[in-house]
């Protein structure tokens, strides 16, 4: 299994649209054939601190995720947030 932990500090003024876009990406990611798990976690101390826990069958499946339309749309949407 190949696991990625992505730590993000979202800008407070964009938090809700950031979470919406991130949850949409996660919902699509779990349908990928190589995906094992995709969790969107928020800090209880600071809700703008977000951790993405992504588990894939292998490194190739993780790399394939970064080429999907939903991932590319997410990256473009949240780039400045």
Q: In which residue ranges do the predicted regions lie?
A:
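Short, well-ordered beta-strand segments in beta-rich or mixed alpha/beta enzyme
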Residues: 2-9, 39-66
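Short, surface-exposed ligand-recognition loops at beta-strand->loop->(often short) alpha-helix junctions
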Residues: 9-18
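An amphipathic, aromatic/His-enriched active-site/gating alpha helix that lines ligand/cofactor pockets
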Residues: 20, 24-36, 55-81
